[in-house]
Amino acid sequence: MVTNITLILTLMTLASVTAQTFQYSRGWTNGKRDGHKRDELRDEVLERILTPCQLDKLKYVLEGKPLNDRLFVPCDYIEEEVNQPKRYKGERNHELFDVFQ
């Protein structure tokens, strides 16, 4: 009987020591993994490596959306299109102007 109790206490002690060692060796604190700083650092590194246009393209592909021509166009061309001012195109509105003149 005494050996059974001793064996149970020894196993419980060994299990609690092993669990505590695992908890502190893996960087766990209060049940949460200490990875928040690493996530922020990873995001900063990605922002330095990839432009917003490239991130949008990567997100588009990872979401499983169908490939289109816009994915294969270099980001420089897309950014130039966005930065250019919108031009007035009067060809479509000739009939409207004729009515008011």
From Swiss-Prot:
UniProt KW Signal keyword: yes
Modified residues (Asparagine amide): 30
A Pfam match: Corazonin
InterPro entries: Procorazonin
Signal peptide range in chain numbering: 1-19
Keyword tags: Amidation, Cleavage on pair of basic residues, Neuropeptide, Pyrrolidone carboxylic acid, Secreted, Signal
Coiled-coil segments: none
Function: Cardioactive peptide. Corazonin is probably involved in the physiological regulation of the heart beat.
Protein name, UniProt field: Pro-corazonin
Source organism (scientific name): Bombyx mori
Lineage per the UniProt record: Eukaryota, Metazoa, Ecdysozoa, Arthropoda, Hexapoda
Gene symbol of the encoding locus: crz
